[in-house]
């Protein structure tokens, strides 16, 4: 069972650089290449957090979906939600192409992440029937504070930017 190519529930000051990630699909999860979050899974680790993470100059191929970032999505609280994440200079190709199917979204953000930046990345090839970027606010909590998206090449999919329960476009960014 392959759930994700890279996942962090608790890590600080991580640099993921110059790697080649290949092959993940919907099975145990929705096929995301990368999932970062701050998690206190059993209720005994309030200090568990994921902060100060950089993904730089990596290649991702044949994935069901791209990046999913969640501030603190679990029932048990953490002292610090996911924060200070930089994704820069990465190449992502063949999202949601059989047999590597999945959620199909290049970017999913939810549950109060902070200071998330995507700068100079390229997404190419794939099947994007949903939003290119989705802010999941279905639980009434802001998806992300201080989101930066600069100089990227990304397909528009059916919609460019969307937010659950709100819609697409400018309204999704507010």
Regions found by a protein language model. Give the residues of each.
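Glycine- and acidic/polar-rich repeat regions and solenoidal domains
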Residues: 1-174
């Amino acid at each position: 069972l392959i759930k994700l190519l890279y996942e962090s529930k608790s890590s600080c000051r991580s640099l993921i650089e110059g790697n080649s990630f290949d092959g993940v699909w919907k099975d145990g999860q929705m096929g995301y290449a990368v999932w970062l979050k701050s998690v206190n899974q059993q209720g005994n680790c309030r200090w568990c957090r994921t902060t100060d993470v950089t993904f730089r100059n990596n290649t991702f191929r044949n994935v069901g979906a791209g990046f999913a970032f969640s501030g603190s999505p679990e029932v048990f609280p953490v002292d610090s939600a996911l924060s200070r994440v930089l994704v820069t200079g990465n190449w992502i190709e063949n999202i949601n192409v059989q047999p590597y199917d999945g959620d199909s979204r290049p970017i999913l953000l939810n549950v109060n992440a902070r200071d998330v930046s995507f700068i100079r990345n390229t997404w190419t090839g794939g099947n994007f029937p949903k939003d290119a970027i989705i802010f999941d606010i279905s639980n009434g909590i802001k998806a992300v504070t201080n989101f930066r998206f600069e100089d990227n090449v990304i397909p528009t999919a059916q919609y460019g930017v969307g937010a659950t329960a709100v819609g697409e476009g400018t309204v999704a960014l507010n």
